[in-house]
Amino acid sequence: MWTRRWIQFLVLCLHLWVTVEGYLGVFRGDVNETITLSCNNVTELTAWFKDNNSGVVLACDGENSSDGRFSRINGSSLVITMLQIQDEGNYSCSKCSEDKSSQAYIQLKVSSGPYNVLADISPTRTLPNGTIYTSVGSNLSFGCSSNSYPAPDLEIVLQRTDANPEPFPSIKGNNFLQFNLINVASNYQGNYTCSAVNPLSGRKLNSTRQLLVYRPPITSIKCYANNSLGFSKMLLSCSWPGGYPDPLLQWEQDGKIIANESFAANTKDTLVTYLNSSSLRVRQQFQCSGKHLSTKENNMKTCQIQIDLPLLESQPMRTCFTGENVTLSCSVSGAVPSATITWLRNISDPESDIQPGKKYLISQKDSLSYLTILNCSHEEDEGYYTCKAENVLGIKEINVWLTVNKPHNIVGLVTALLLLFLLVVAIITGTVLYCDPQIYLKANPFRSGATDVLVLVDSEDEENEEVFDTAESVQYTDIVPNVPPPAANGHLSKHEVMFHRPPESTSSDLFSEVSDDTGEENQNEEI
């Protein structure tokens, strides 16, 4: 029961609001459009007022306003042409046959735009086709603006070629949006769309700018020269990879630009051209210039090459024993473009290159070439071998002489030398012993423990001086009496030195007595 009464109450309130207040709703129109306001389906003549009767838009006695933009249709509906923003407001209508107490109210809203939508990205540089670009690592400011009434809702969206749209900051009810990006990366390249939406009309307008994010090449510019087309032409190759977009490359010869040729080897980051060998000279210089849009306009990168003949080095002579292997080497330096190395046998066939096979092995490491001759033969292999280096400028050659010898009996030679050495030692030893046999006696190892007795015999005075050394296991021997007669002048003419071995039984006292007696005799002789 209460629910039923409550519903009846709401219906009554709505009826009173419609009849008493007379609110007819909201009308919306765009600038410069024509809109018709209906006065609650009234068919008789009505008057129109704006903003709480403060201004008469269309009186009962008139069909049109003074400016002609307001008119009455069907006696009750108000027609507004060339709608303007200032026309927005609250309108009321009333029957001319009644007083103003019974009025119907209408709210008119006017929208404009959006228009003049602009997406701005700065600082950037512009290509001839109008596309803007920047470099990796730059700081950019993004702006989005629009004219609209009421103020629009603004948004910036990034659309990459290989990803879903990425929204950026947005703002509602404002005519300008701005944000900054610091240290821009390569993945921020794409189309930036500034979207402006009129919140009243829902009308949407976009402005799109394509932004390219360039990056310089990651490597330095490099130049090459080669003989890939043969020795009649020289290829010049200039490469500067890793950048976006592709660099601009140009070859120069002695300050003059070389016309670019179309080659299959030409790529976006490599420029290849060729020159005839007849136009080349030793130590001629070439330069490749590279320019990239990510760098400053005057910041160009260059590389130079100087062409030259090869320089050869090798051992002039080599030796090989019959049946063994030998390796000849040849080094090349200074050749630009690089030289091709071949080996020739200038005795058997000087015009034919040596080919690898059962007899020869050829290998090359960088600028070194090796020729290995297997199973050397004096008849076949001895002689000159030629190392030839050739590039587009010319040919250089160097000769190596190979001598093939028979192997020697090394063991027999060593044995002969050893026997000769032993013979010389034996001869020297025999000669020494023959000239002075006492050397052997003194050096006799069996007498190392003996003590010798030295006896001095005075032939003139028949006096003996004996010096004894203590010893063990020595046999005693008497003085030999055969003494020559004294000299006529009374002087001592000769001494004899004799060694004796005292017997083991001789005591030390005997040696002391002999020493004392000898001393006394010497004193008497001095007196």
Swiss-Prot record:
Residues 14-111, 123-212, 216-306, 310-399 form the Ig-like C2-type domain. Residues 1-13 form the signal peptide. It is found in: Membrane. Pfam families: C2-set_2, I-set. Residues 514-527 have a biased composition (Acidic residues). It comes from Xenopus laevis (African clawed frog). The keyword DNA-binding does not apply. PROSITE patterns: IG_LIKE. SMART domains: IG, IGc2. GO terms for molecular function: cell adhesion molecule binding. InterPro entries: CD80_C2-set (IPR013162), Cell_adhesion_signaling (IPR051275), Ig-like_dom (IPR007110), Ig-like_dom_sf (IPR036179), Ig-like_fold (IPR013783), Ig_I-set (IPR013098), Ig_sub (IPR003599), Ig_sub2 (IPR003598). Keywords: Disulfide bond, Glycoprotein, Immunoglobulin domain, Membrane, Repeat, Signal, Transmembrane, Transmembrane helix. This is V-set and immunoglobulin domain-containing protein 10. It comes from the Eukaryota. Residues 501-527 are annotated as: Disordered. The lineage of its organism: Eukaryota, Metazoa, Chordata, Craniata, Vertebrata. PANTHER family: NEPHRIN (PTHR11640), V-SET AND IMMUNOGLOBULIN DOMAIN-CONTAINING PROTEIN 10 (PTHR11640:SF157).
